[in-house]
Amino acid sequence: ELTTFVHRLPDGDDPFVGDLPVAMAMATTSAVHLDDSTEVVLDDATMAELTHLADVLEAVAIPVSAQVPPALLDALARGDDTQRALEARISAALNNGVGHDALSLPSLPLDPSTAAAAGETDLYTEWLRDGEDLLATTTNSSARRTTRLIPDDISQGGARLLRDLGTRLLVMPVSVYDY
């Protein structure tokens, strides 16, 4: 899906309103899978997606807000040489001065709507803080809580939980909000 913003240049009588700020948001789609000993599994598809993320972060010259499960980045950092090298690429790209951001997510997948409906807002908050700590440890950059990419439906309770935890912008595809 492509959304186009039109920024009209002022004519002779219009005051200058500034340049149109441009940014990009992206999220990985690989799920976090745990093995029998509760270790995160990094399969070939996940590695390919994280490699693509590193490629994009290294290549673009505009700020990117990247939403990646902290457990995946932590598994890379604790993995073999190839995995650690990929984590180092992602960390370096997030800190390369372009203005990239890592968006906050819980340490392990926990849907805010499900947490709100089950009365587990404290657990969600704890896991969110743990995820932010993992991101800070693995990427040497602080996580941004103000924006959240929402790929699926979100309930009012889930949106309220995110709002109460500092989220100010929900970015979602048309299929989620256009009923």
Placement of each model-derived feature along the sequence:
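Generic recognition of flexible, low-complexity loop/linker segments
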Residues: 11-12, 52-53, 133-136, 159
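Metal-dependent polysaccharide deacetylase catalytic core of the NodB/CE4 family, i.e.
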Residues: 60-151, 157-158, 164-165, 177-178
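Short hydrophobic alpha-helical runs that function as membrane-insertion/retention elements
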Residues: 103, 169-172
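C-terminal active-site subregion of NodB/CE4 polysaccharide deacetylases
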Residues: 171-179
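Active-site beta->alpha N-cap acidic-glycine motif
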Residues: 2-93
